[in-house]
């Protein structure tokens, strides 16, 4: 099995990895259809989106400037806990949802490209996140608690098996 994936050496992404997430997925999409040579092949990408600072629109446009100022999320303290200000927490949640929209668009582009190339039907495709985030005023965004467990541990897992036609949703986790 040979493997390939974006190298992360993109000069347009000099900052932390979260600035590069959409670019890395786009690079993977562009590689669909390239001849990997004989035998099985693994394409992979580690994309850090959606992730703080939640800076992308569903169209993939960055709406905040690069730099440390963009890392600040109103309502989220340095201790990674939310303020009691529900408006600030709701705004952060909306920013998160915008970036989820960007991820959804990229996944759709990947599927479309694989279908157009004829690789979708025979492919095993796995998409997974490593953690969620809680948007509960006054509580930590990432530290599990009885109040935040459902948000933090509710992570997406998408598996498309080779030859699979019908999908299903399984919420038993």
Regions found by a protein language model. Give the residues of each.
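Catalytic domains that recognize anionic headgroups
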Residues: 1-173
């Amino acid at each position: 099995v040979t493997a390939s994936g974006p190298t992360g050496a993109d000069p347009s992404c000099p900052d932390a990895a979260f600035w590069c997430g959409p670019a890395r997925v786009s690079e993977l999409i562009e590689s669909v259809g390239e001849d990997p040579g004989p035998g099985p092949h693994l394409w992979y990408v580690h994309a850090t989106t959606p992730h703080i600072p939640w800076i992308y629109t569903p169209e993939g446009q960055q709406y905040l400037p690069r730099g440390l100022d963009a890392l600040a999320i109103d309502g989220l303290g340095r201790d990674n806990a939310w303020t009691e200000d529900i408006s600030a927490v709701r705004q952060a949640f909306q920013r998160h949802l915008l970036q989820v929209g960007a991820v959804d668009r990229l996944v759709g582009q990947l599927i479309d490209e694989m279908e157009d190339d004829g690789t979708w039907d025979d492919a095993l495709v796995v998409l997974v996140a490593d953690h969620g985030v809680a948007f509960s005023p006054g509580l930590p965004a990432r530290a599990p608690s009885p109040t935040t467990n459902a948000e933090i541990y509710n992570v997406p897992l998408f598996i498309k098996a080779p030859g699979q036609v019908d999908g299903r949703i399984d919420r038993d986790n």
